[in-house]
Amino acid sequence: MGPVQQSVPKASIVIPSKNGGALLGVALQRIFGQSTPWPFEVIVVDSGSAAASLEILRGFPVRLHAVEPTAFNHGLTRDLGASLARGEHLVFLNQDVVPCDDRWLLTLLEPLEQGEEYAAVQGAIREFPDRPRFYWDSGGARFYFTRESERWIHGHGGIGFSTVNAAIRRAIWEACPFGDAVFMEDKKWQHAAAARGFRIAYQSDAAAFHTHNYDMPALVRRCQQEGFGWRLLGETYSCTDMLRDTLSPAKYGDLWRGLRAGHVRTVAEVLFPFIRPWLVFRGNRLCRRYPA
């Protein structure tokens, strides 16, 4: 059936955006090409896009809601989008995420449609096959090799909940919204949901493409933000953790193989296994404010 016209939507897809550009247009084209037996809607909460990106958004039947750039907050902005939604299920996507096929939405919501067992669903995240990408990837164990990430996933049923590609039952969100979160709104929500006994399903076939290609400043900022975000969640990354992760040998063999094959090309890619532990530690223990 596809995008909603007048009928009440089964799902509301919420996308925070700012200068999403051409890739957001590709994502929306794939979203509005979804094959579903029920209607859905797309809500974009935009925080200050330039005219070119706004023109792309207006080329699609999205419900566009604007907020001031200074008002953007990873948790509260998603809550705003959810509050505008009419669907039974809330789907959260980043603006640079493209569903892999036309059954992504239907597959993502299957666990929620089949009964009341699950409160939320985590979709799979894959790297774009045809875009430049950071050697260490950006959404898996090779990037998140440090112990705080391992501890979190181990303590939460093997899932690190991510609003890059996820769905939450609307009634559950109403009882457990994201709240104020400058970063890691998804992990904050996961922690609160687990405390209430809510379960999250993993749908490997509900996959979407998402790739980062970090330069050095972006990499430093990202890793420090993670450390700071863990601190806000009460997770400690100690000096001992940092030293053990720095000295762990497996990633250096991976680095050597990447260098020999010519896949490691940038300074950021060379330094990543050495500096990620320190940067996470710095964000977690030393930064007094969010490292923007």
Region roles according to the model:
Residues 183-191:
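Acidic donor-binding loop at a coil-to-helix junction in glycosyltransferase catalytic cores
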Residues 149-168, 182:
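A recurrent flexible, glycine/aromatic-enriched loop bordering the glycosyltransferase active site
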Residues 221-292:
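Non-catalytic, C-terminal membrane-associated alpha-helical segments of glycosyltransferases
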Residues 123-124, 139-158:
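Short, flexible, basic/aromatic active-site loop/helix in glycosyltransferases
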Residues 68-85:
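Glycine-rich, basic loop-to-helix element that forms the pyrophosphate-binding segment
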Residues 98-135:
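Conserved donor NDP-sugar-binding/catalytic core segment of glycosyltransferases
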Residues 46-54, 97-98:
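A conserved acidic beta->alpha catalytic loop
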Residues 90:
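Short aromatic/hydrophobic "clamp" motif used to bind/position activated sugar donors
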